[in-house]
């Protein structure tokens, strides 16, 4: 899959989340597609930063992301974070994703 296709999929994922009431502050592509080291079968690693996750526990966040992934039916591996969690950067995924590519938001 080329980078344009990946960006289109991430865009569809973000739109699907927003249609479900999640205001996405940022979407950060990280992992193999961000670094250019993808191979056939690579999934699309993305961090979704949203204020909507502030009062949600881990399992509720997974449910929200999983429902959107099922709707677009693409190989997305997503992690939900609040803006504060992203800014602190103390979660291991945030440390990896800091070197990623901002593909939505600012």
Regions found by a protein language model. Give the residues of each.
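Catalytic core of pol beta-like nucleotidyltransferases
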Residues: 1-25, 35-40, 51-106
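P-loop (Walker A) phosphate-binding loop of NTP-binding proteins
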Residues: 32
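Short beta-strand->loop micro-motif that forms the acidic, two-metal-ion catalytic signature
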Residues: 45-48
């Amino acid at each position: 899959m080329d980078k344009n296709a990946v960006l289109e999929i991430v865009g569809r994922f973000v739109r699907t989340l927003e249609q479900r009431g999640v205001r996405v502050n940022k979407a950060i592509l990280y992992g193999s597609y961000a670094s250019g080291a993808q191979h056939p079968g690579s999934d699309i690693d993305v961090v979704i930063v949203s204020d909507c996750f502030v009062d949600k526990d881990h399992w509720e966040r997974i449910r929200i992301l999983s429902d959107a992934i099922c709707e677009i039916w693409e190989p997305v591996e997503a992690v939900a974070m609040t803006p504060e969690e992203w800014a602190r950067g103390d979660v291991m995924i945030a440390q990896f994703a800091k070197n990623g590519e901002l593909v939505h938001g600012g």
